């Protein structure tokens, strides 16, 4: 009797989980209805990304900046936090990354209404590839076409290697991207994309590359602007 009453007490004290927006419930229902393996696939992807991947590393700092970097085989990105922009309420956007020889702010909040999803697109494209643990090394176009190196990479990293080693809008890039199109896309949960050593790391406004793949057209026009020194 005592165990039974204790069980009932626990049941009464049980708190409901977080309330999700109706639109999200509709999306979940439609996804499950369309593919019975949807939930299992998402859980496996989350477990996979919880264990693997590269992380942002603190390097050093001076009076004005904290310097950070992330590396993934032949890829490297330099980032910094502007100290005077760091706020106590954690709502600031102090992050910048080095692109094309200049420092560009990311995660900036805009006061005017509008569609800002594509503002930091180049950063999130490169970030998706950098946090992935695929072995991005020894790229050779002939070997890539034979499939020797290509199938060691996930779809996002394979697209990234093509963009890095070919010219924008070239026929060579288009042919290689068409070959990569056969790869199975690996979903990367957005919580993993934002996992960082600091609380003010920016939110991803565009889910391209994380919940769905970049198109051939988008990669064909993409410029590689990182500095890998």
UniProtKB/Swiss-Prot annotation:
Its main location: host cell. This is Virion infectivity factor. GO terms for cellular component: host cell cytoplasm; virion component. It holds the Pfam family Lenti_VIF_2. Transmembrane segments: none annotated. Keywords: Host cytoplasm, Virion. It is found in: Host cytoplasm; Virion. Determines virus infectivity.
């Amino acid at each position: 009797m005592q165990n039974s009453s204790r069980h009932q007490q626990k049941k009464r004290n049980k708190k409901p989980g977080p309330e999700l927006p109706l639109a999200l419930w509709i999306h979940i229902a439609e996804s499950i209805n369309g593919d019975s393996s949807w939930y299992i696939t998402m859980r496996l992807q989350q477990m996979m990304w919880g264990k693997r991947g590269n992380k942002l590393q603190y390097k050093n700092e001076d009076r004005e900046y904290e310097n950070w970097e992330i590396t993934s085989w032949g890829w490297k990105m330099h980032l910094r936090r502007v100290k005077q922009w760091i706020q106590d309420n954690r709502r600031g956007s102090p992050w910048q990354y080095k692109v094309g020889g200049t420092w560009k702010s990311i995660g900036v909040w805009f006061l005017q209404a509008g569609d800002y999803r594509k503002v930091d697109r180049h950063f999130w494209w490169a970030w998706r590839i950098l946090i992935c643990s695929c072995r991005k090394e020894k790229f050779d176009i002939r070997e890539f076409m034979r499939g020797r190196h290509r199938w060691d990479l996930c779809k996002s990293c394979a697209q990234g290697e093509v963009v890095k080693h070919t010219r924008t809008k070239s026929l060579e890039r288009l042919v290689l991207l068409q070959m990569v199109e056969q790869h199975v896309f690996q979903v990367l949960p957005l919580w993993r994309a934002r996992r960082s050593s600091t609380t003010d790391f920016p939110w991803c406004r565009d889910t391209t590359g994380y919940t769905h793949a970049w198109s051939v057209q988008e990669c064909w026009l993409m410029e590689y602007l990182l500095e890998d020194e």
